[in-house]
Amino acid sequence: MKNVREFIWPLIGLLAVIVSGWLLYRELRGMSLDDVWDSLTAVPSHRYALAALSTLFAYAALAWYDRIALLHLGVRHISWLFVSVTSFTTYALSHNIGASVFSGAVVRYRAYTSKGLSAPQIAVLVALCSFTFGLGTILLGGVVLVADPTLLHRLEELLPSMLTNPATARIVGLLLLGFVALYVVGSVLHLPPLVIRKAKLEYPRPAIMVRQLIAAPLELLGAAGIIYFVLPSHLEPSFIVVLAVFLASFSAALVSHAPGGLGVFELVFLTAMPDIPKADVLAALIIFRLFYLLIPFALSLVVVLLFERARLAQAWRGRMVADGSVPPPPLSSSDQ
């Protein structure tokens, strides 16, 4: 059964790419590459700079996820720089590969074992980082739906009419915020672990929980900011609209298991932004993929190669010393 699951999820991801690609083709037919290029070149340079700063902000927040998990484990000897580079590499790879839990676990295992962490500790770290991200999505989703439940009307082509109803949307938002409130209560009152099937949620101590609530939304705010800043300034909707559409698009991309959410993310975003020219929206999404996914992915490959080269060189030197191939240092006069 496990082998079947390992085969079926990549197949679902591939199917999601094909279906969303076909739907995107229908959505974008008639648009020329010149239209998209004109939209890309129309973005002012200072807007590109703001998008780049939003990218740095988002990845800094992701590094805080790792730091919070290490504090939960009582690990304080690892430097912020090492944590930041590890987190950056982890998410840059997993965002593009698609299997975020698997690829994140592999990268973190290679990095954190070099700092003395055990496999069970790294498993807890990976789980807590994933939960922190989910907590941020739930928290922001609840806030957005309660603040403006009419936002789901933008997805009426993709969702049942019952869900896009403002009253239903507000109830969903309140339920999401209720989940966050229960998590806070569980942490403050030191409740026993919450068990759902095989998953067990250990409530962290309040100091960790508060950090999670602060850090969890920041990455999503930064990522949504990339798109917000490069949309046409005379047409751009409010930030809460961009954030709501981003949350829906990003969540759909994750659920689809498509590598990097390819096609799925764009389809949902374009559908939910009918009031902005499609070429301008597509240009903003291209910039998002470049800043948030492709450039970090290229840099992460360099980091992995340098790290593995250093580990290999260290292992080789250790083997040479063990085999006696490296002569001992000469004796000093005091030793003779």
List each language-model region with its residue ranges:
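Transmembrane helix boundary and interhelical loop/hinge segments in multi-pass membrane proteins
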Residues: S100-R108, V264-F265
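Transmembrane alpha-helix interface/packing and boundary motifs in multi-pass membrane proteins
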Residues: T89-G98, V245-E266
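Internal, well-ordered alpha-helical segments in soluble enzyme and binding-protein domains
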Residues: R108, S118, V124-F131, I138, ...
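Interfacial segments of multi-pass membrane proteins
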Residues: A111-Q121, A244-V245, E266-A283
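Predominantly cytoplasmic-facing regulatory/coupling regions of multi-pass membrane proteins
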Residues: M1-F88, V146-L254, I276-I287, F291-Q336
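Membrane-embedded alpha-helical segments of transport systems
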Residues: T89-I97, T113, S118-G141, A252, ...
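Membrane-interface segments at transmembrane-helix boundaries
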Residues: L73-S84, V107-A127, R197
